Amino acid sequence: MSWFYHNKLILVLAVILSALLSSTEKSSAIFGRNLNKSKVTTRKSSGEFIIVSGGTALRKWENLRKEKYQHDRWWGNFIRPARARIQELQNEYGDQCKITWLVYKPSYESRSNEDGKPLISWIESVRDKYKISLLWITEGKDIINYINNGKDRSQIKIAGFEYYGHSNRHAFLIDYSNRIIGVSTVWLHEEELTRINRSSFLRKSKCISYGCNTGESMSKKWRKATGVSMRAAIGKTDYTNPLKPTVVPPGSWNDSKSIFKRKK
């Protein structure tokens, strides 16, 4: 009889432990291991960090292309690096770091239906794990509205802005090849940036775009509109590394000493 109760106790403890770990380990299982915690003393930030993840393409469209031209074989191209960046910021500034994550929801809803996976719940599990603010967006103007009015900008300035998603030299392509093959139906164009209230940013705010070609024109319009430089790619970017997108050679970052110039 003691053997029976002993094994029953072990089973109960296992169930409790599983329940405790499920909420914290869910996003790790989906998106990979956590980054190592920094041993460096955390710094204080008086501002807010904004991270934007654009939408993913649908495979039903991309499978019609030649393989070398296909996009988004994995649905999480713009989610995984954003999650890694959230970890980096919390390692650097501590758990009280103000982070708001803007994600284009319609693309992930349709890709969720296509893949038969609960992508929305998985994305929300990142919010829950790191205790950040998640704002679902449906239009390009939602980004500007949040920059200007998401917080009381007289009290909480923007310390950093990062974009992960499709783009061209003139626009963030918030939706791409999801509703129509090879077409963007939702975007934030560089000419719209004049609507940004430049006083929303800290003077030394760090802004980065990991979208293709945004270092060729849009980054210049960003600086003119906000007063803050944007690090961006001249040429295409590659999301093969799930932790940090890179620029495809012979392209380069617009703040690099050797800048690739597009042939005309």
Spell out what each predicted region is:
Residues 2-12:
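Bacterial N-terminal signal peptides that target proteins for export
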Residues 12-22:
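Bacterial N-terminal signal peptides
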Residues 27-32:
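Boundary at the C-terminal end of the N-terminal hydrophobic targeting segment
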Residues 33-143:
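A domain-level signal for caspase-like cysteine endopeptidase catalytic cores
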Residues 45-47, 96-99, 153-158, 202-204:
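A general structural motif
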Residues 82-91, 145-154, 189-200:
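Short, basic/hydrophobic alpha-helical segments
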Residues 158-242:
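Catalytic cores of nucleophile-dependent amide-cleaving enzymes
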Residues 232-264:
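Caspase-like cysteine protease fold
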